[in-house]
Every structure is written in structure tokens, then in C-alpha cells.
Curated annotation (Swiss-Prot):
Annotated catalysed reactions: guanosine(2251) in 23S rRNA + S-adenosyl-L-methionine = 2'-O-methylguanosine(2251) in 23S rRNA + S-adenosyl-L-homocysteine + H(+)
Gene3D superfamilies in the record: 3.30.1330.30, 3.40.1280.10
Subcellular localization: Cytoplasm
Encoding gene, per UniProt annotation: rlmB
Keyword S-adenosyl-L-methionine: yes
GO molecular function: RNA binding; rRNA (guanosine-2'-O-)-methyltransferase activity
Protein name: 23S rRNA (guanosine-2'-O-)-methyltransferase RlmB
Length: 248
């Protein structure tokens, strides 16, 4: 049996119990804690016969790997890792998929924030390269506040090759967010159909090999003197504009 993963934080554990309770092996709660938020978690766990163990603050910190566990940690059966084949399956019967691809975003806090926004916007999947990218660590899951259980997270071997593949086989329009001579203001782009919005890390932007797969680049107009936004903030603004258009 694979080693369990550990989820921590009230929102993350609540969402897991609501959506995938069968994955929860054991709940660890802080000794002496007895409040409404914890009671809700215990009520969600009870119908499934999930083992609940009281633990010290130090024990919870060791399980979570961080002190910011909010008094609850869940030992969880690992989720299967999704890959290129899962992305193909997702797109086979979908001609209105909206995807978010992150090019070497390495900060788990940024990844978690992007996933949270993607889940709120109803995005079909978040795609990242397997190497040199943040993965779904407990920190990313906590920041996602339940979003990681609501949106598909797909890791691919080569992001540029994957973008080329879904363009050729599923007619996905690849839109890069960067300011170059061909970039359109984001509100001028037509986000209908299958679309992948590609975001780069805020310090390095999109790699040239990723840029080469973009059918169009867009930028977010700003009136201030800032040259760039945090990637999770920019992702939220881009996804909002795409969803605004698609909802009519």
C-alpha cells in the first residue's frame, strides 16, 4: 500500500470529506479542541466510520510538516497522478474546455492560489510540467482551500509538446499571457471553444519553447506603474475575463 498523504487545515479537510471521504484513512485532531468548526468535520467523518485520534500540537506539526495545521490533519489514500492520457480523455468529448497551464511555477503557495481560483471559475484542468514545477504538496492543498479536490491537476512530461498535441488533436487555442509586439488586450481576445491559458512564473515569464506554441498572446491592461502581477493574481484576472465572455 502506498504511503498516505497528509492534508491539513479546516477548509482542505472539510472539502475532502465532502467530496472524497473514501480516501480518508484517519483524522488527527488537536487534544482539547472542541469548537463548531471541528464538530462539523467530525460530523462529516462519522457516517463513513473514519478513525479519529486525538494528538498533541507537536504531533500534528510533524504530520503536517508545518505549524499552520489549524488543529486538524487527515491521513489520506493518495490520489492517482493524472497525466497526458487523462488530458486526452478529458478533451475527447468536450469542445468548450477551459484549461490553465502553468509554466514552471515553483512556489506551492502560488500553485495553490491558482488552483483555488481555477476551481471557483469551473476550469476543467490545471496543467503543469512534471519537473521544475510545484506539485500538490500539503501546503499547496491548504492554500487551494478545497480547490484541489474540485479541479483536475495534470502533470505532463513536456509542457510545450503537450500544448502542440492538444492543438493538433483537439483544436485547443493556446493563449499566452505576456506583453510582446503581437499581444492583444485580454478583453479583445475571443475565448470561445477549447482554450488553454498559459501563465509563466512572475520572475521568468513564459519560456521561449512555450511561447512558440501560443496561437496568440494577451496582456492585462494596467494603469499603474507596475510591470507585472503575482502569477496567481494574474491567473485570476485572466480566468475571470475568459469566463465572463463564455457566460455571455
Amino acid at each position: 500500500m502506498a504511503k498516505p498523504e497528509y492534508y491539513y487545515g479546516v477548509h482542505s479537510v472539510e472539502s475532502l470529506l465532502e467530496l472524497e471521504p473514501e480516501r480518508v484513512l484517519t483524522l488527527f485532531t488537536l487534544k482539547g479542541r472542541d469548537d463548531q468548526r471541528l464538530q462539523k468535520i467530525l460530523e462529516l467523518a462519522e457516517p463513513f466510520g473514519i478513525s479519529v485520534q486525538k494528538a498533541s500540537r507537536d504531533s500534528l506539526e510533524k504530520l503536517a510538516g508545518l505549524p499552520f495545521h489549524q488543529g486538524v490533519v487527515a491521513a489520506v489514500r493518495p490520489h492517482p497522478v493524472l497525466n497526458e492520457k487523462d488530458l486526452d480523455q478529458l478533451l475527447q468529448n468536450n469542445d468548450q474546455a477551459l484549461l490553465l497551464a502553468l509554466d514552471q511555477v515553483t512556489d506551492p503557495h502560488n500553485l495553490g492560489a491558482c488552483i483555488r481560483t481555477a476551481a471557483a471559475m469551473g476550469i476543467a484542468a490545471v496543467i503543469v510540467p512534471r519537473d521544475r514545477s510545484a506539485s500538490l504538496t500539503p501546503t499547496a492543498r491548504k492554500v487551494a482551500a478545497g480547490g484541489a479536490e474540485k479541479v483536475k491537476f495534470i502533470q505532463v512530461t513536456n509542457l510545450a509538446r503537450t500544448l502542440a498535441h492538444i492543438k493538433a488533436h483537439f483544436f485547443v487555442k493556446v493563449v499566452g499571457t505576456m506583453l510582446d509586439e503581437k499581444a492583444l488586450p485580454i478583453q479583445k481576445y475571443d475565448f470561445s471553444g477549447n482554450v488553454a491559458i498559459v501563465m509563466g512564473a512572475e520572475d521568468t515569464g513564459l519560456r521561449p519553447i512555450t511561447q512558440s506554441q501560443c496561437d496568440q498572446t494577451v496582456y492585462i491592461p494596467m494603469s499603474g506603474n507596475l510591470q507585472s502581477l503575482n502569477v496567481s493574481v494574474a491567473a485570476g484576472m485572466a480566468l475571470y475575463e475568459a469566463c465572463r465572455q463564455r457566460l455571455g
